[in-house]
Design a protein with these regions (language model features):
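Extended amphipathic alpha-helical scaffolds
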Residues: 1-101
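A glycine-rich phosphate-binding loop feature that marks nucleotide/adenosyl-phosphate handling sites
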Residues: 2-5, 23-28, 49-55, 154-162, ...
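Stable alpha-helical structural segments in soluble proteins, enriched in small hydrophobic residues
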Residues: 29, 136, 140, 144, ...
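A generic local secondary-structure boundary/capping motif
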Residues: 60-63, 70-72, 94-98, 143-147, ...
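Glycine/serine-rich anion-binding loops at beta->alpha junctions
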Residues: 65-75, 161-175
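Glycine-rich, flexible beta-strand/loop modules in the N-terminal catalytic cores of phosphate-handling
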Residues: 68-153
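A short glycine/serine-rich beta->alpha loop
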Residues: 121-127, 159-167
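Mobile "lid/hinge" segments at catalytic clefts and subdomain interfaces of large enzymes
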Residues: 180-202, 208-238
């Protein structure tokens, strides 16, 4: 790719130069180009309009007859499988902490294995990111659940990121919503989520605060926009 060509040219022109500096210069230039194209020309890395969403598709069930419910959701190259398990009220999670005690009848677990980004890393313990993403999707889904009087079962989800190119947490909301419909959970309405991004252009003032500057908001950000963008925020609803 371009980075390999740049590193080769850099090594030829400056054989005693720092490799880390070359990588930093390349990253800075790409960052400037991504910002300039978005802010001045409304152009994104994959050619989409600023408010254009990638191709969507979803499948309810079809994974295994043994599962209580499942949903697969695709948004571009982001693919998430969500598996639903229903249990009796006694299967709830018992909360016994310093500040919180009670029972939890709805749980959502999120996994982000290395293969979802084409890596062969070790499958370790759940990290802080996975816990946070799982909690984020859980909060988004909690509002569409039926009341316990009409549906007293314990509801448990595991959302597995199969491929990642932006916002697997919000794709988990979509896949879990599909899984609940597949499993016969009488949800109030289907829920969906998406990631928004911000591209900001502006020099720093002497006070250290950013002066008013042009900005653009992107809908459905993917990997490069998430990496080079200045801010991202997740939105979920019905």
């Amino acid at each position: 790719g371009l980075e390999e060509i740049w590193m080769k040219v850099f090594a030829e022109k400056l054989p005693d130069g720092s490799k880390a500096m070359a990588e930093a210069l390349f990253e800075e230039k790409v960052n400037d180009i991504v910002h300039k194209e978005a802010i001045e020309k409304d152009r994104r890395p994959d050619g989409r309009k600023l408010d254009e969403i990638r191709e969507l598709s979803g499948v309810a069930g079809g994974v295994s007859k043994v599962l209580h419910g499942s949903g697969i959701f695709f948004r571009g190259a982001t693919h998430v499988l969500s598996v639903l398990t229903l249990g009796n009220p006694k299967d709830c999670q018992m909360l016994d902490g310093m500040e919180l005690r009670g029972k939890k009848y709805f749980m959502h677990h999120y996994n982000f294995p290395p293969f979802s980004t084409g890596e062969t890393g070790r499958m370790g313990a759940t990290n802080r990111r996975s816990i946070g993403h799982g909690a984020l999707a859980e909060k988004a889904l909690r509002g569409i659940l039926p009341n316990r009087e009409s549906f007293p079962y314990t509801i448990s989800f595991v959302s597995e990121s199969m491929a990642s190119n932006g916002s697997t947490s919000m794709a988990s909301v979509c896949a879990s919503s599909i899984a609940m419909m597949d499993g016969g959970v009488p949800i109030k309405r289907p829920a969906a989520g998406i990631a928004m991004g911000l591209m900001l252009s502006g020099a720093k003032s002497t006070s250290g605060r950013s002066e008013e500057a042009p900005y653009k908001i992107l809908t459905d950000i993917q990997g490069p926009e998430d990496h080079h963008g200045d801010m991202d925020f997740k939105v979920a609803g019905t």
